[in-house]
Amino acid sequence: ILAAGVCNAFLAGDLFNLFVSFEMLLAASFVLLTVGGSADRIRAGVSYVMVSMVSSVIFLLGIAYAYFATGTLNLADMAIKLQDLPSGTTTTLFAVLLVAFGIKAAVFPLSTWLPDSYPTAPAPVTAVFAGLLTKVGVYAIIRAHTLMFPGGALDDVLMIAGLLTMIVGILGAIAQTDIKRLLSFTLVSHIGYMIFGIALSTPLGLSSTIYYVVHHILVQTTLFLVVGLIERQAGAASLRRLGGLAAASPVLAILFFLPALNLGGIPPFSGFV
């Protein structure tokens, strides 16, 4: 169901099918988050569902407003009809959709759910979530920004949101002692890079964002998978208890070190490019 929801989101040609995709992702994510039935996982799953339901309600309001204003939900048709509407109407519609998609993408200040939810799930589930779930939200923002609202009315807002997401995410990561929570905050920070690229409203900015999305899917997924191996080897994900792990398991250390360098943008890795 999760894979079908992701595929449908990337292939959707109208807002309603995109909404259905988001709901498929929500249902599958809740099951995967709460697998095992521990109190922490159930709490994280309920928190994630409540935040996602708020996003769904806002998205539904945006869909209703879009249909009322244009008479269609097809993205290509809307792109044409929105050109004839007053700027206030299009800006309001874009703002509503941005809030809905921003929650899915974990854009600050709508990102607080992510660091609380991801670390509680099993490592393979967290890896899939890190690689795909937030990227669906970023993709939805790209579709809305480039196809329906190319005028750049809210570019300044997007740019500020991107900058704040970068800063808050990395400051949150610095304060963590659990490596899974550290990576979760780092994930939020890197979402900010993607949003900033979209806000530039240039072909170079958009192509850079798409490249960075692909890079981040590969690197962040790898890191969460390796952290799962580290947790299994050491019995904990706390940095305080992982001292000497490199000497005890040099292969794991290398497996973590290489994608970490990549994520940090160290040349010649793809994160630097």
Model-identified regions with their sequence ranges:
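Short phosphate-coordinating micro-motif centered on Lys-Gly-acidic
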Residues: E23
